Amino acid sequence: LATSILSYIKTNETHSNWIICEGGDDKIYLDTILPENKEYRILPVGGCGNVVKLFNLLLNPLLIDKKERKEFKGKILCIIDTDETKMNYKFENLKDMPISLRRLQVFKSNNEEVIKLLDVAKQGTIYEKTEIEDCLDPQIYYNSIKTVILSSQDSNIIDLFNNFELNREKKFSKISGDDSLLLPNGNEAYRRKNELVSFLEKPEIKMLVAKEYSQESQSTNITHALAIEIIDYFEESMITVS
């Protein structure tokens, strides 16, 4: 797979930009939030471990052979979640490489929520569990989970969800934790919130929500902060390899 991607990027006449992501639901979100006039090839590979493996397989030939880099006609962005368990990644100097491994991170800067794609080799002090579902438009995501939950025929989850309301002060779509998109109405809802989070984290539910989000987004004209981060990465200039 790595050989095929490298070969395609080198032989394609126009710039070929690739995004390697974890899962099929990630691909749906990326297809949804990125503008149609930006042509990205988005490839889900089934989990963080596979993204990192493919990154290494793509990186090694570029580290070894300058000619390989010189023939590159595009860039590759590998995106992973920030998991609860902090991982330590060590890479050689990747400055001006046409490939990068970044982790999603939502955090507060000057009391404002921001999204960054942080280089995993430069961990820094900012580290909080983040996945793509935390980086979306809050109103559209709320509408999407509401539609999926009400269609689920799970009366316990429906009753529980009806005891929450949208936190309109949120800039993004994080559900878990106290700083959440969902505001509980009463102690029982607060106490049982993890049941709702667990339901929404089921793979089949995540996929349904992603598809619903894509549908909901068609009638809006919103620029997603994550999309801006991704576009900025691909538009950053690199020093030409001589």
Model regions: which residues?
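Short secondary-structure junctions and interdomain/linker hinges
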Residues: 27, 61-69, 139-143, 216, ...
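Nucleic-acid enzyme cleavage-core boundary/entry regions
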Residues: 1-16, 27, 179-242
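Activity-critical C-terminal alpha-helical subdomain
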Residues: 74-201
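Generic structural signal for hydrophobic core residues of well-folded globular domains
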Residues: 33, 139-140, 144, 148-149, ...
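RecA-like P-loop NTPase motor core
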Residues: 1-85
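Residue-level signal for secondary-structure boundary elements
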Residues: 66-67, 144, 148, 169, ...
